[in-house]
């Protein structure tokens, strides 16, 4: 059993230190940030360690030196000045109505007002900006120090009101007033740090903070949240070893599986690989490679917006776009890409300097598989019987019995019941759906696989077989099969050791489904020259 505990659901730095929990030391970044600028903003996905980082900043600025014993910052900080800290956590409620919004903000400010003996006249209860200003003034007057302001999940009110345009507009005005003293009282402020998931227009809330430093895409702060590989092996080695023993794997094999499932985030051009901290901690605690961060309830509006913009799994796993396309305000929801990036469904995988183009992809298997599952549920029109049927049919016929022929009627039945509203009647759409289904099932699947003789529409690899798919629209399955044979696609896999199966499928324009298919098992002996005696 591990000598330390995993901080499941714990986001308070002092509790982690005092409770002997596993902790990846981020204090060197805390010191660097504290001496960088005055106003800072950081966007990171949900459950990615933002609140813990804010809590660490709070402990540092409060001068609690004893909490940092043995950590990097202990050797860096010499003064340990204690500042008054105002911590505004906006994630502590749901902003589904004006009444809720007023109640939550009132409760947040009351906590700070009590610290400085401030009493509020009921008539001024909703004057949130004036109340924050009075807190700042009182903190400075009573301590003789500049104030540190930490704002966690600033965008929670916006996310909760996204489906009600009028409510969101009203809340935006309330929040603009709420935060207005930050600029007005700049002289009394030592440091401001604001976190959130989304990048809402700066003018919409922080209208006067024209010197706000955006840290989201900066290399030097790319690992302030999340866990790097070096941190994982340094601080969590004991847990990895236990997980390896539990699963009958080596240490390196376990590390590889953790990387495949939960690694792959990049928040800047030169960012090192970042593991999802929520998933890693839960996986190590359970000693299982399950899905933790990704929830199956991907917002329907996001998938519908993808449909409107003709975006599918094929697009999302290979996007080349400029930063202005994804690092942009999201409140209008006209483009799903910024939401997908800022929410953690997509991440930076590369950068082409000349064209200033970023390569966006899914970060890892957990997200890729989870997102495809959400899409398949959407394709199923949320009919769980259809969803369960396709999963069961694939598992039984392909994974267990290695029988693609037996699976094809089930795949056809899945297409037969597609709502017309989500069908783009073309070959690419049908290719995207098959790709999404296989991806959802966690399979090794590639589209447009390049060989010396052309590009294969789709290649599916299981433990037993390699399936080569050629898809046609308004033609015939025989024509699809002829292309596989004429271009000799199977040759590329002749030395793999698994069986190779050719699958030709034709889709009907009128039926909007699979019309016919042909399956042929390859004779791989044809590709091997007999040894001379």
Feature annotation, model-predicted:
Residues 148, 465-467, 501:
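Structural motif
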Residues 168-173, 473-490:
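Mg2+/Mn2+-dependent nuclease catalytic core
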Residues 178-185, 338-346, 435-439, 443, ...:
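Metal-dependent nuclease catalytic cores in nucleic-acid-processing enzymes
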Residues 413-446:
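Acidic-basic catalytic patches of nuclease active cores, encompassing PD-(D/E)XK
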Residues 1-426:
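Phosphate-binding site recognition
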Residues 492, 496-533:
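Domain-level recognition of nuclease-like catalytic cores that cleave nucleotide substrates
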Residues 139-143, 437-463:
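Active-site metal-binding core of divalent-cation-utilizing nuclease and nuclease-like domains
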Residues 434, 458-473, 487:
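Conserved catalytic cores of phosphodiester-cleaving nucleases, focusing on short active-site segments
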């Amino acid at each position: 059993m591990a000598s330390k505990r995993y901080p499941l659901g714990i986001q308070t730095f002092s509790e982690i230190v005092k409770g002997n929990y596993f902790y990846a030391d981020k204090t060197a970044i805390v010191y660097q940030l504290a001496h960088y600028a005055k106003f800072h903003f950081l966007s990171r996905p949900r459950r990615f360690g933002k609140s813990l980082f804010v809590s660490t900043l709070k402990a540092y600025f409060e001068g609690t030196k004893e909490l940092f014993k043995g950590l990097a910052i202990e050797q860096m900080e010499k003064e340990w000045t204690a500042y008054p800290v105002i911590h505004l956590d906006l994630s502590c409620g749901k902003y589904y109505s004006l009444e809720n919004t007023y109640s939550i903000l009132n409760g947040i400010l009351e906590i700070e007002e009590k610290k400085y003996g401030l009493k509020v006249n009921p008539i001024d209860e909703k004057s949130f900006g004036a109340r924050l200003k009075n807190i700042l003034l009182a903190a400075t007057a009573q301590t003789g120090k500049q104030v540190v302001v930490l704002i966690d999940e600033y965008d929670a009110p916006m996310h909760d009101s996204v489906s009600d345009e009028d409510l969101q507009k009203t809340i935006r005005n309330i929040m603009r007033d709420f935060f207005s003293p930050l600029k007005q009282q700049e002289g009394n402020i030592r440091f401001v740090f604001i976190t959130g998931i989304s990048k809402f227009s700066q003018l919409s809330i922080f209208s006067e903070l024209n010197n706000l430093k955006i840290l989201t895409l900066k290399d030097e702060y790319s690992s302030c949240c999340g866990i790097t590989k070096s941190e994982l092996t340094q601080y969590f080695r004991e847990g990895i070893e236990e997980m390896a023993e539990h699963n009958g794997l080596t240490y390196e094999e376990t590390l590889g599986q953790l990387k495949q499932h939960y690694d792959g985030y990049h928040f800047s051009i030169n960012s090192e690989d970042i593991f999802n901290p929520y998933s890693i901690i839960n996986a190590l605690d359970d000693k299982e490679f399950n899905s933790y961060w990704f929830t199956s309830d991907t917002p329907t509006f996001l998938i519908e917006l993808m449909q409107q913009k003709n975006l599918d799994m094929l697009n999302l796993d290979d996007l080349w776009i400029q930063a202005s396309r994804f690092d942009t305000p999201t409140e209008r929801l006209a483009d799903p890409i910024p939401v997908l990036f800022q929410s953690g469904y997509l991440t930076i995988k590369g950068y082409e300097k000349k064209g200033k183009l970023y390569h966006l992809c899914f970060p890892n298997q957990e997200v890729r598989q989870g997102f495809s599952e959400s899409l398949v549920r959407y394709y199923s029109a949320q009919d769980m019987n259809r969803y369960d049927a396709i999963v069961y049919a694939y598992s039984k016929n392909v994974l267990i019995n290695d029988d693609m022929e037996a699976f094809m009627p089930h795949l056809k039945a899945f297409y037969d019941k597609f709502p017309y509203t989500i069908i783009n009647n073309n070959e690419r759409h049908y290719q995207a759906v098959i790709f999404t289904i296989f991806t959802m099932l966690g399979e090794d699947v590639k589209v447009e696989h390049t060989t010396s003789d052309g590009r294969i529409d789709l290649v599916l690899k299981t433990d037993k077989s390699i399936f080569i798919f050629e898809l046609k629209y308004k033609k015939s399955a025989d024509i699809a099969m002829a292309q596989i044979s004429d271009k000799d696609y199977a040759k590329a896999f002749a030395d793999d050791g698994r069986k190779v199966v050719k699958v030709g499928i034709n889709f009907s324009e009128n039926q909007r489904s699979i019309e016919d298919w042909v399956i042929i098992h390859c004779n791989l002996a044809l590709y091997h020259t007999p040894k001379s005696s």
